[in-house]
């Protein structure tokens, strides 16, 4: 929602592979991701949570990278080392950049924080998210950070939303006063709605809501958010 792999996750993996003498293209990796996506979804549906600790994160992501490389035809003997180096690369702060609409949003929300608005991060991320945000110079814009790698719960689990509500001085009985913005329909929209928080779906890629019957506030850019909040147009 706020940051992205720079220049892109396929480009980073292709670069790491090239450093090991393996030629894979970003386009091939995107196609490979579509192939392994059903298995990733199955594992999530079965309750697997991959950011709850650094060891589980490494195990999950190296499995993902190995699967992507396998789909691209990389030899089994070469894959483990490349998958490990991919994990190292994505843990490097230099691999991440804030979206162009992040800074303007945070500046706009700072004005509202001065009037009493609580602004927090609720993220499925490893425990190094806060140092990353400090490195990017944006951590000071938030009143609280609720990170799956620190609380050992992941969206859409209700418990992590309870942690975020508590950080804002709220609970389930006052959850309707909160707004949660995210770019994952299952983790963010469904998860927030499940505990009574008003969801806003950030659909940068204009994918369209998968649940056509659900009335959900949708934005294409974070720049649209402050006006919606000010107008009270976001409903639980």
Labelled PLM ranges:
Residues 27, 74-79, 103, 107-108, ...:
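Asp-based, Mg2+/Mn2+-dependent phosphohydrolase catalytic module
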Residues 1-100, 104, 115:
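N-terminal helical cap/lid subdomain that shapes the substrate entry/recognition surface
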